[in-house]
């Protein structure tokens, strides 16, 4: 229970930090930046799935000092590379990798993709709406102390991510409509 309260306080602080910014993109970036620093991770990211193709795109990323951004290399990523993640997401499960070597034999494509980014461990949860997975949100190289708790934390954040992305999409649509 103590951890849940800590997570809720962290989320509230992240929301407050994000509300200091004027645009949805700035708010999302501030939100994940705050969480990344608070968690002590190397990288936090959001991937949004294409509704028309079997691809996913890294749309937001925060990196700790000294960590190389990967967002530019993770556009139009075939979902086949991480199909097993989606199989887990469909069952309501998160991805927890304590040691990248654990997946080397069973998931060689995923291993190659992830180890090439200097990822040793990660926790990833899906987000969605209307009972459909729309993407995922992950943390690379989090502290090893509480992986299970981190999945609870990410599950709590998922609804907020969906809300922030919906606000962003409405903002984009209203700007597009204003041009006509």
Give names to the regions the model predicted.
Residues 120-128:
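A short, aliphatic-rich beta-strand micro-motif
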Residues 98-121, 141:
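Signal-transducing coupling segments at domain and membrane junctions
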Residues 135-145:
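Short beta-strand-to-loop transition segments that serve as allosteric relay/switch motifs
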Residues 1-26, 37, 170-180:
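Signal-transmission linkers at sensory-effector interfaces
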Residues 145-166, 176:
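Amphipathic alpha-helical "output/dimerization" segments
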Residues 45-90, 134:
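GAF sensory/regulatory domain recognition
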Residues 20-59, 67-69, 121:
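Helix-loop-beta substructure at the N-terminus of cytosolic sensory domains
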Residues 127-137:
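Short hydrophobic/glycine-rich mini-motifs in sensory/regulatory modules
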């Amino acid at each position: 229970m103590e951890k849940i309260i800590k997570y809720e306080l962290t989320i509230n602080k992240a929301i407050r930090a994000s509300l200091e910014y004027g645009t949805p993109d700035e708010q999302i970036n501030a939100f994940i930046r705050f969480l990344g620093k608070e968690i002590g991770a190397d990288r936090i990211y959001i991937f949004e799935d294409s509704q028309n193709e079997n691809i996913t795109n890294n749309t937001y990323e925060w990196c700790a000092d000294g960590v190389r951004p990967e967002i530019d290399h993770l556009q139009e990523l075939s979902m086949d590379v991480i199909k097993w993640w989606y199989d887990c997401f469909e069952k309501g499960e998160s991805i927890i990798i304590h040691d990248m070597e654990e997946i080397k034999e069973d998931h060689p494509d995923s291993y190659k993709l992830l180890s090439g980014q200097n990822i040793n461990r990660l926790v990833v949860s899906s987000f969605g709406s209307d009972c459909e997975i729309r993407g995922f949100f992950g943390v690379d190289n989090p502290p090893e102390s509480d992986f299970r708790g981190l999945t609870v934390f990410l599950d709590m954040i998922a609804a907020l991510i969906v809300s922030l992305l919906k606000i962003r999409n409405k903002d984009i649509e209203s700007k597009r409509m204003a041009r006509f």
